[in-house]
Curated annotation (Swiss-Prot):
UniProt PTM comment: Phosphorylated on cytoplasmic tyrosine residues.
GO cellular component: cell-cell junction; plasma membrane
Job of this protein: Receptor for netrin required for axon guidance. Mediates axon repulsion of neuronal growth cones in the developing nervous system upon ligand binding.
Disulfide cysteine pairs (residue numbers): C124-C175
Gene this protein is translated from: UNC-5
Source organism of the structure: Petromyzon marinus (Sea lamprey)
Name used for this protein in its record: Netrin receptor unc-5 homolog
Organism placement in taxonomy: Eukaryota, Metazoa, Chordata, Craniata, Vertebrata
Amino acid sequence: HREEQARYIVKNKPVTMSCAASPATQIYFKCNGEWLHQKAHHIEEREDETTGRSVREVQTDVSRQQVEELFGLEDYWCQCVAWSAAGTSKSRKAYVRLAYLRKNFEQKPLGKYALLDHEVLLHCRPPDAIPQAEVEWLKSEEIIDPVIDQNFYITVDHNLIIKQTRLADSANYTCVAKNLVAKRRSSTATITVYVNGGW
């Protein structure tokens, strides 16, 4: 059995669910407990190059509208059911979710004055998103890579720590959130590093 994992509908593009079983005399999709109409299936039979056995593969498209019609009840899911002389086998449920990335950051970084050689913390809580947004930080529009510059540390909850400020860390910092749908930028925070007793 080759099985499906969670799939995401981006904007209005349907997702294609596919499933293959060998051996199988029949193979169909069941979505949210209901059998899909035969017309909604695209079934192909082919030979597995390694085993030489016959493989039956089924595909179906799931549209945004289908997922929205189930709104509020539960996640939309499909499962593949195959029959053969040996009996029936079912795949795990594969979920179809509507992908989105909200516009507003839950917490934005704020500019500040920072004393030379001191630690600075910049907060970032990305917008609500499915699938969860990945976060990166920009320093003057360049991506910060803590592996290369170990004076920077990005926490598990997406905050940026400058361990010991250097004069070169005076810059504009921006938090960027991205997923399948879009890329969003927080407002920019300006860090000004100063030397005690003077600028």
